[in-house]
């Protein structure tokens, strides 16, 4: 598999993971707040980190495409 294909696959994987964390955060807001407020910091941090990892993967792909 070429480097570009690997990077594209990584971007898709990271996007899926970020979306999954975002969905968990959404579910918390829709279904368990305000009672589940103590879950908020952990879910927010995990979502933030997953989005950062996705962004890094996108940047790596763009750099490789140049």
What is each residue range found by the language model?
Residues 1-15:
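Short, charge/polar-rich alpha-helical segments
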Residues 24-65:
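Short, charge-rich amphipathic interface segments used for partner binding and complex assembly
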């Amino acid at each position: 598999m070429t480097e570009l294909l690997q990077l594209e696959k990584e971007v898709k994987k990271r996007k899926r993971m970020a979306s999954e964390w975002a969905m968990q955060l959404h579910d918390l807001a829709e279904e368990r707040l305000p009672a589940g407020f103590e879950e908020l910091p952990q879910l927010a941090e995990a979502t933030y980190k997953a989005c950062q990892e996705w962004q890094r993967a996108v940047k790596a792909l763009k750099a490789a495409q140049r």
